[in-house]
């Protein structure tokens, strides 16, 4: 199963649509947004995927103040907004999604060994640098970077048991 992963879109509809286009081209079956969406119009763009059966999951980031509107937008497009920490299972893998602003909480989740994959955002920097994933305590740890246009390097990922990074 291919899974699209992005974070920190910060209301950038153009780059969000670029990521969605790449997710469509690669036939992803699910998309994970690791927070800092900012406002509902960004989420409505994902309808292009969810109307074709792609599952959409997201969590709140530290800049997501319009929580009720975001929750409604996820419901309208058929996605699930999972709160501050998301726990899902896809293709037999247990995922934890956390924006990552609290480093101690992030470390505690990774050290728990309860998840196969830990996805985080917040730093606007792809992690780990130079490679697509790092395994810590038997958990795949990744940060797709940021998809917003203010950033020097705009990136997202998709997971197919091999992680592929791409630039927007």
Give a label for each model feature.
Residues 2-89:
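Core catalytic region of metal-dependent phosphoesterases/phosphodiesterases
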Residues 2-10, 92-101, 139-145:
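Active-site-proximal beta-strand elements of phosphoester/diester hydrolases
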Residues 10, 26, 33, 99, ...:
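Histidine (H) residue identity feature
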Residues 30, 95, 116-117:
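Short, Asp-centered acidic motifs that coordinate Mg2+ and/or phosphate
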Residues 33, 89-90, 135, 163:
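Generic beta-strand structural signal
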Residues 55-57, 101-162, 166-168:
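Conserved beta-sheet core of the metallophosphoesterase superfamily
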Residues 64-113, 148-151:
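Active-site-proximal segments of metal-dependent phosphoesterases and phosphodiesterases across multiple
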């Amino acid at each position: 199963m291919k899974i699209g992963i992005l974070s920190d879109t910060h209301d950038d509809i153009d780059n969000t649509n670029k990521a969605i286009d790449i997710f469509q081209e690669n036939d992803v079956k699910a998309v994970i947004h690791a927070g800092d969406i900012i406002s509902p119009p960004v989420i409505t763009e994902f309808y292009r995927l969810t109307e074709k059966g792609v599952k959409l999951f997201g969590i709140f980031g530290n800049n997501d103040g319009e929580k009720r509107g975001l929750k409604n937008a996820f419901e309208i497009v058929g996605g699930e907004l999972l709160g501050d920490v998301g726990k899902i299972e896809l293709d037999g893998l247990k995922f934890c999604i956390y924006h990552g602003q609290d480093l101690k909480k992030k470390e505690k989740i990774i050290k728990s060994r309860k998840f196969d994959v830990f996805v985080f955002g917040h730093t606007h920097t792809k992690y780990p640098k130079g490679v697509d994933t790092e395994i810590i305590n038997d958990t795949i740890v990744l940060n797709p970077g940021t998809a917003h246009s203010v950033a020097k390097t705009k990136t997202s990922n998709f997971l197919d048991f091999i992680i592929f990074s791409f630039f927007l």
